[in-house]
Amino acid sequence: MSHGLEPVRVPKKLKVTVQGNSMSPTFKDGDKIQFLSLGGSRLNVGDIVLVRHPFQKRLNIIKRIKEIKSRNLYFLEGDNNEIGSSSDSHSFGLVSKKNILAVTENKFKTILKNKSINKELIC
C-alpha cells in the first residue's frame, strides 16, 4: 500500500584523485576532488562531472559541462586550452547522461566563451 511517500535517496560521496592535466588550471595532477553520486541531480552548464569514457568503458574521466544539447545529451570539455591536452566531446562527441556518474560537491569558477560563470571556489 502506497502512502505517496518515496524513499529518500542520500547522495553517496566519492573521492577521486586527478590523473593528468586536462582540467588544469582548475585541477592539477594529484589533486583530490569530492564528488556526489548523480542520483536525481539536475546538471547545469559549468558543472564538473565524473564520466565513464564513451569508448573506453573502464576509464572514468573528469570534465566540465560546456553545453546541454537535450535533456540527456551533454557536450563536455576539459579546462586545459592547450591543443591535444584533453580527450573530450571534441574527440568523442556528445555524452549521454547515463555515462555521467557523479558531479562535484562544490562549484568551481571558470570562464566559458567570455562569460564568467559565478561559481564559488571551495577547496
What role is predicted for each listed range?
Residues M1-C123:
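Extended hydrophobic leader/signal-anchor segments used for secretion and membrane insertion
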